[in-house]
A protein has these predicted regions:
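Multi-pass membrane proteins that catalyze or facilitate reactions on polyprenyl-/lipid-phosphate substrates
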Residues: 1-228
């Protein structure tokens, strides 16, 4: 923010961070488009099945993934009343530093638990709520959302590849919701529109770097461990 000259350019705390996550969201769509496409198709098939009173057996993996994402998103609504207070913590370097250390510890420990086998077919609905709670807690500045949710998945016995995939797909409704809320503030005249070019640069860089990081993380997960 300091480099691009947009620090404090908005009365809405965290607006620039939200825009950066929008770039990462684009990267998620590109990296996981086959899975997301299947989920979209199954969403409409599910509506059709509901209208006709039918239920496929077994439930298609993509349809179950939709349910896991919905349940994993619910805990975010619990923290909405304190959203502004949490965003205000970004100015406290002690909080951010401690949160970064916690993220590192979570990733270190999670990489040393027994490798799990759960995927979208076998993960429990309660697992989705727990990972969703981890995502809600990761709204604290300094806590990595993806790192925290991936670690939570590993603790719950998720297959490493599924933990990564679920973490990033779970981010879609969260980031979309955050951007809708921030857009409302922007339309209210709280954004310095002269900084829009800097915002665009930030989003583009976040998209490119985000995609590269997702690809790298997928490759690392393929070997079954995140560490050496």
């Amino acid at each position: 923010e300091q480099l691009l000259g947009v620090e404090g350019a908005s009365e809405f705390p965290g607006f620039f961070d939200v825009l950066l996550h929008l770039g990462t969201l684009a990267a998620v769509f590109v990296a996981y488009w086959p899975e997301i496409r299947d989920m979209i198709v199954e969403f409409f098939r599910g509506i059709d099945d509901l209208a006709h009173g039918t239920t496929p057996t077994p439930v298609p993996p993509a349809r179950r993934m939709i349910l896991l994402v919905i349940l994993g998103t619910l805990p975010l609504f619990v923290i909405l009343p304190v959203k502004d207070w949490i965003e205000g913590l970004s100015s406290n370097l002690y909080v951010v530093g401690a949160a970064l250390l916690i993220t590192g510890c979570l990733l270190f420990i999670s990489d040393r638990v027994r490798k799990g086998r759960k995927n979208e077919r076998s993960a429990r609905l309660s697992d989705a709520l727990i990972v969703g709670t981890a995502q809600a807690l990761a709204t604290c500045p300094g806590l990595s959302r993806s790192g925290t949710t991936i670690a939570a998945g590993c603790f719950l016995g998720f297959d490493r590849k599924f933990a990564v995939r679920y973490s990033f797909i779970l981010s879609i409704p969260a980031v979309l919701g955050a951007n809708i809320l921030s857009l409302k503030d922007a339309l209210g005249g709280e954004i310095v529109w002269g900084d829009v070019p800097a915002y665009i640069v930030g989003v583009l860089v976040a998209a490119v770097v985000g995609y590269a990081c997702i690809r790298l993380l997928k490759m690392i997960a393929d070997k079954g461990k995140f560490g050496a």
